[in-house]
Amino acid sequence: MYSQPELSISIAGLRLQRPVGNASGILGWEPREARLVEEGGGGFFVAKSVTYQPRKGYPQPHLYPVAGGIVNAVGLANPGFREASKMLAQTVEEASIPVIASIAGGAPGEWVEMASTLEEAGVSAVELNLSCPHFAGGGLELGQDPAAVASVVSAVASTLRIPVIAKLGYSDRLVDAASKALEAGARGLTLINSMRAMKIDVYAKKPVLGNRVGGLSGKPIHPIAVRAVYEVYGETRADIFAAGGVESWEDAVEFYLAGAKAVQVGAAFITIGPHVLRSIVEGVRRYLWVEGFRSLQDIVGYAHRA
């Protein structure tokens, strides 16, 4: 009798019924946004990053399409963690999938206070944004320093009861930073974020983004993200959420084979639509059945056997 392959999986202390969700940054904190992910076929919702104080973000324009992807610099616009936590409390109450908060701080004390408040709001986990490519004094600048990563992760993980996930960007010190994050108490990793990029309008003769420099996301960074996941998993066997250019089931399967247990969809959620999540889930299930695997877990890290 035909039995569908099992897609549910445990990752970073969470149990996901479907191993695909949205990446932080493309949606906010409200219940209606989590419903977009649920109705689109996703298995978890990641909220937009919040900061200690409210931020207006960078001047417009924030987004610019490029071949296969998007260059963006929103500037972490958000109402501050206190206001966001109120919205997330309502989202948690209404959602039937895990809700993951995302925070971007400065001093360790800020990270701890934000994370503690969001834990009280009922979120399932907290993702530490240590990789925003255009957040001066934090983000990628912080995430490239393994000692600084360990300091922030340790401060937060030692305070919370819920899982802490470190989101790291690509750098020459990624494997070291990932190892330090795990040693400091991170239950899982998100790899990677968008990559520093710029687009210039040749007729206006100036950068197209209000902030001039932004982050490139979408298909162009997918091979880089696959390499990042492969290298980090090879060294750490960590629980990994993979992000970077996922728009098809094949992209997702690449990440699973490299070592990821779940994938986050960003640019394609915007360019294709929320239904891309269901398309990926169904494609992955079909792939497992055709290839003779009983579960998603069976292919996690399989490429390392080659």
Curated annotation (Swiss-Prot):
HAMAP family: DHO_dh_type1. The keyword S-adenosyl-L-methionine does not apply. GO terms for molecular function: dihydroorotate dehydrogenase (fumarate) activity. This is Putative dihydroorotate dehydrogenase A (fumarate). Catalyzes the conversion of dihydroorotate to orotate with fumarate as the electron acceptor. The lineage of its organism: Archaea, Thermoproteota, Thermoprotei, Desulfurococcales, Desulfurococcaceae. Homodimer. Keywords: Cytoplasm, Flavoprotein, FMN, Oxidoreductase, Pyrimidine biosynthesis. It is an enzyme of class 1 (oxidoreductase). The active site is at C132. It is found in: Cytoplasm. GO terms for cellular component: cytoplasm. Substrate binds at K48, N72, A73, V74, G75, L76, N129, N193, S194. Its cofactor is FMN. The gene is pyrD. Belongs to the dihydroorotate dehydrogenase family. Type 1 subfamily. FMN binds at S24, K48, S49, N129, K167, I192, G218, G244, G245. InterPro entries: Aldolase_TIM, DHO_dehydrogenase, Dihydroorotate_DH_1, Dihydroorotate_DH_1_2, Dihydroorotate_DH_cat, Dihydroorotate_DH_I. GO terms for biological process: 'de novo' pyrimidine nucleobase biosynthetic process; 'de novo' UMP biosynthetic process. Its EC number is 1.3.98.1. Pathway: Pyrimidine metabolism; UMP biosynthesis via de novo pathway. Binds 1 FMN per subunit. It catalyses: (S)-dihydroorotate + fumarate = orotate + succinate.
